[in-house]
């Protein structure tokens, strides 16, 4: 059994760590609230863009944009959004597991895979995982903007335009609620036709001045909006996961302190009992 002094030292060390995890929990809660506000403010735009694109994909167009056309799949690309920092439970691990399972299915069909990473954890993971990393961006911070994702998006669009990749997916952690964050894979290109009844009726659009020019700008803006919304959803998920992880760490530290305090009390009691026994034995010898 460790000495009372050693146990006291461990208790003190754990208490210091507990203060840190408690502070990190409060910081994460504050950041999560702000991230939720950004996420909520961006959702209407992203959803309306999705709605417009859904109608266009099912519409009778005088000009069919290449992003609307299916083609033989020889190579696919994933834009994977992760965190820059750790201490957020299994958030990144679960996401990477989902991606690797999906990649395995494509490779079994003889399809090659490329990646683009947003977040340092994704950058480091896919550098080790194998496959071609076409673009990488990290250090998005707590207040990401659309300009932060434009570079990665343009690289993937260029690869798609040139026929280097035939399908593009977006991977991120969808914020369901504080306790639940779900990794998802959404197809970006070609634009999937929605099965929603709202999009089933055909819409005829009149484009002014030029349908090609308008659709070119609209498609790029749509992709950028979806990737940006994935970034803010992932940011909210990160802070929620970190808050939960730090609360669990704080609670575990409290339980460990209680257990060590009990061990310390037993050790102290054993030491006192030993001293009394020695005194009694000495007195009896006299």
Swiss-Prot record:
Similarity section: Belongs to the ATPase gamma chain family.
GO molecular function: ATP binding; proton-transporting ATP synthase activity, rotational mechanism
Job description of the protein: Produces ATP from ADP in the presence of a proton gradient across the membrane. The gamma chain is believed to be important in regulating ATPase activity and the flow of protons through the CF(0) complex.
Oligomer and partners: F-type ATPases have 2 components, CF(1) - the catalytic core - and CF(0) - the membrane proton channel. CF(1) has five subunits: alpha(3), beta(3), gamma(1), delta(1), epsilon(1). CF(0) has three main subunits: a, b and c.
Membrane topology: Peripheral membrane protein
GO cellular component, as recorded: plasma membrane; proton-transporting ATP synthase complex
Cross-referenced CDD domains: F1-ATPase_gamma (cd12151)
Protein name as annotated: ATP synthase gamma chain
Keyword Membrane belongs to the record: yes
Keyword Cell membrane: yes
Gene Ontology biological process terms from the UniProt entry: proton motive force-driven plasma membrane ATP synthesis
This protein's UniProt keywords: ATP synthesis, Cell inner membrane, Cell membrane, CF(1), Hydrogen ion transport, Ion transport, Membrane, Transport
NCBIfam families: ATPsyn_F1gamma, PRK05621.1-1
Main location: membrane
UniProt xrefs under PROSITE patterns: ATPASE_GAMMA
Gene behind this protein: atpG
Subcellular location: Cell inner membrane
Lineage top rank: taxon: Bacteria
